[in-house]
Amino acid sequence: MSEERSKISLRSGGKRKNRPTISAPRQISAPIPQDNGMPQPPPEATMADEPRMTRPRPPPPGGKTSDLVKKRYSTRFGNMPTDFDPSSNPMPALPDLEKYMQAQVGSPPSRGGDAGGLGPMGREPPRVDIRTLRDPNFAPEQYVAEVLGEATEDEIRDYEDALKQLKARAAADLQQNVYQNRTQFIKISKEAEKLKGEMRTLRNLMLELKTNTTALRASSNSADSSGSLGPEFSTGLSKRDRRSSITDRTALWSAQMQALYKSVEGSQKFLPNSQGRHVVQNAGPWIELDNATYKSRRSMQIFLLNDHLLIASRKKRKIDGPGADARGPMTKLVADRCWHLLDVEVVDMAGTGDSSNGRNKLADAIMVRGGGQNESFIYRTEKPEDPEKTTLILNIRKTVEELRRNLQSERDATNKAKETINYFASRDPGLLQKTELLETLSDIKDMLIEVDGKQQNLRWVESQMDELDINIALQQIEPAVARIEMLKNLASGLKNNMIAQDFISFKVDERCARLATLVVRELVNSHNDQKKTKRNVTWLVRLGFEDRAREAYLEARSEVIQKRSRQCIFQGDLHLYIWEISFVYFMVIRNTVICFQSCFPPPMMSACVKWAKEEVDAFNVILARQLSSAEEGGEVWTECVNRAKEHASMLSDVGLDFRNLVGRNVGTSTTVPGGASAGLGLS
């Protein structure tokens, strides 16, 4: 191997006849095809074949050694890959960069010279800072000096417009919040009132449940707690007559009281007959005890009524007197004491007293305490451990609770009636002048009316009035007029309920007058706009105030004529002054008649014609006053009158011909009909 290597040298060797030619380096734009002796087609043009601005390279120096070095360090590419497509681009297509460039490129400068939100001086224009304005320590002078110190007139005007918009938006938000809070307050008040009634009902039900539970417990503890009057108070009524109907119950109670009057002497003096009064329990015989020694004093009998407690004493009947019935009972009952249940207190004496003898002496006793003189009496049952005591105490408690509940219901009903009167009167002070309607308010608090097939009370009417008040306050004229029409139709349909009809009509008429005042004021302010005038007149006609609308409109037009005529200044030229005055009068009259014909109903046109004639008469007064210095029939006089008649011919466009009235009695008219002021041509 060494010998072979020694024979190979770069400087020596056999001379070759055909030396390879090494060309200069060139840029490769396509894979070099394998040298297989076959002619290859020229590669297609690619992106690399585009013309390039390359600098020409000087030809390398030739030589044997340089050719060998170039051959040694040359590179040869292998075969092409199997998936190579010579017709495809050597690199993927570039994405569209235009959409990325648009985000970076700003908007073109405006015509005013502002670029990028900067002012004309290359600074940002002043902006309204809401946080600074909300600062409690806000100093207006300092803020204006800092923000608008270097601002231009246009920037100050824009800043002022921004402040006005902010103020308008804040005012609108404040007004919306006020009426929203008022609506919520009304809704909450209604819910609170409804909840109050439900709580009152719940309380009554709980008291009734407590009473029934106590009565059931007493019935379970005692086998005989029917509370009948005994054999001597038998009314002779059968079980059928004791049904729970109101008529039978009233008859039963009346029979009980008659039996009580017959059996207890003097009881009618303490307990006069009244509706609903009846006997709850005949407690049977009792013994009155001394308060100090607890010794027996006399025999008594206790009767419990639904509102009183009657104590009757037992006395021996005299049988030796004239007319005495020997077959009757040996004793009689005489009414001794009687108290109202709410004036006394019944106390169970069990647990008090001396129990050294085995059984407590007061175990079967009760104490009745109270009355007008704050006295106390002790009563004990004749039989020890008599169940009448327990039954009497339970019945007294039950009766007292029922009595208090009935009184509370009556008091609540009275208060509710007063609240109803105060409620309606406070909302509409005008009701205080309606004495007849005010007296019936307590009767209509629960009155129901039919609205669209549903039963509604008058509080629903009040809610509609609240909505109407809100519409009027917000100057929402169309919803307010529609609601008034609905309520008027509702009131007219209540022919069988005159109280509710008068109540609704009174409230609707009051708000209707208030709304009409608002629309009339708007009509006077916008009488020059025919579209607004027609809208306002339509509202007033729907409200029933067409006469008021006509008077307000014609009066406003008369004021316009007076105002425009006073603006005509007399500067020495009588003909020019008469021309101006006549043009003002007849042009305004013509426009008024045109607007009146399109806005008001046709039957009212006669009022407009009458008004036009009055204005022509007022013009004649002015004309006569101005021509008083001119010779009647002269050139100046004739020219002025003819000019006035020429302007009066404009009324023929609206169907009026007042040319014969112009200049009539000019030489004698000196006053304005109806007291209207006459223009003197003075500034």
From Swiss-Prot:
Keyword Transport attached: yes
Chain segments annotated as coiled-coil in the UniProt record: 145-213, 388-422
Regions that span the bilayer: none
Localization per Swiss-Prot or TrEMBL: Cytoplasmic vesicle, Secretory vesicle
Keywords: Coiled coil, Cytoplasmic vesicle, Exocytosis, Protein transport, Transport
Residues covered by region (Disordered): 1-91, 103-125, 217-242
Domain of life: Eukaryota
Keyword Coiled coil appears in the UniProt entry: yes
Gene3D superfamilies membership: Exo84p, C-terminal helical domain (1.20.58.1220), Exo84p, N-terminal helical domain (1.20.58.1210), Pleckstrin-homology domain (PH domain)/Phosphotyrosine-binding domain (PTB) (2.30.29.30)
GO cellular component, one term: transport vesicle
GO biological process: exocytosis; Golgi to plasma membrane transport; protein localization; protein transport
Residue spans of biased composition, Low complexity class: 219-228
Subunit field text: Component of the exocyst complex.
Function: Involved in the secretory pathway as part of the exocyst complex which tethers secretory vesicles to the sites of exocytosis. Plays a role in both the assembly of the exocyst and the polarization of this complex to specific sites of the plasma membrane for exocytosis. Also involved in assembly of the spliceosome.
Record-stated family: Belongs to the EXO84 family.
Protein name as catalogued: Exocyst complex component exo84
Origin species: Neurospora crassa (strain ATCC 24698 / 74-OR23-1A / CBS 708.71 / DSM 1257 / FGSC 987)
